[in-house]
Amino acid sequence: MSDKTPRKPTAFRLEQPARVSAASEQEEPRRPRAVKDLEQITPQADVFDLTDDEAAELEILDPAFEAPERKGWSLSRILFGALGILVSFAIGIWTEDLIRALFARADWLGWTALGVAMVALAAFAAIILRELVALRRLASVQHLRKDAADAAERDDMAAARKAVDALRSIAAGIPETAKGRQLLDSLTDDIIDGRDLIRLAETEILRPLDREARTLVLNASKRVSIVTAISPRALVDIGYVIFESARLIRRLSQLYGGRPGTLGFIKFARRVIAHLAVTGTIAMGDSVMQQLVGHGLASRLSAKLGEGVVNGLMTARIGIAAMDVVRPFPFNAEKRPGIGDFIGDLARLNSDRNARK
């Protein structure tokens, strides 16, 4: 044991100067009081934004469209078919007479002409075969569109799976759809309602293509709008609108996996023109025209720039019509683009150009 005596218990006070000083220096809460002369910030209205009524009016002017199926032979088809047969006979007889005449003059000339004719015939047959394959692909896309709409309407799971498999086959060579196709592959053994499967395939596979298609339509509309604003002649405007519209239709068909040939492109163009003829002209409603050339933009856009906006909107309508025709599935889960999606960008583009002048 230790010899030291234990210390007696004593009381002592703990000093906490930091807490005491912090508590003493704490400010008293401010008493509530009324504040006058509040600064109000009023957002400036954008003259390029459409109201709900104007947007609804544009949607009415550009409804969705399904081309009716043609049955039987029309008089125009019979006429052009008969003329085509006559022209083929004429070319064949002319070629035969030419080869006979060359054989009569010199054998080597006749054999050379015959070889050239055979090469031309083989190339022509290859072109016809390629066009027939492209037309068959186009017809399959149109049938797929109808089958997908029927499967979604009837909620038929078997028909929906068949339509989705066809869509995956069409999109197999499109890199943007790889992620969506992998997702659908993982759901092969799952039980999904037919309508939900159609909507899922549209969302996962066609959504990236729809975004790219909107970009293509917007860029084409901007180019037409700018060329119209700077071109000195109306004939140049018309020519460029036709050129840009044809290129837009072909690029949209290639984007969605159509890959049309020459005849397929002509058929696409005819269906797009039929779309525009059925859904109405490019004429705007009263409220939209007032916004374009009246109250909102009259002080911002010159007459030439206003024409650029209208031509750009016409190109946008052609692009939307082309999307309706070449898209494998109808718009169901995704929102169908309308004129209102492009009018603001076109008006701002021309307004900025006018401001820089």
From Swiss-Prot:
TM region positions: 78-98, 109-129
Keyword Transmembrane (UniProt): yes
Alphabetized UniProt keyword annotations: Cell inner membrane, Cell membrane, Membrane, Transmembrane, Transmembrane helix
Keyword Cell inner membrane found: yes
Region (Disordered) residue spans: 1-36
Domain of life: Bacteria
Membrane topology label: Multi-pass membrane protein
Biased composition (Basic and acidic residues): 27-36
Subcellular location(s) of the protein: Cell inner membrane
GO cellular component term of the entry, any: plasma membrane
Family label: Belongs to the UPF0283 family.
HAMAP family for this protein: UPF0283
Protein name: UPF0283 membrane protein BMEI0952
UniProt organism field: Brucella melitensis biotype 1 (strain ATCC 23456 / CCUG 17765 / NCTC 10094 / 16M)
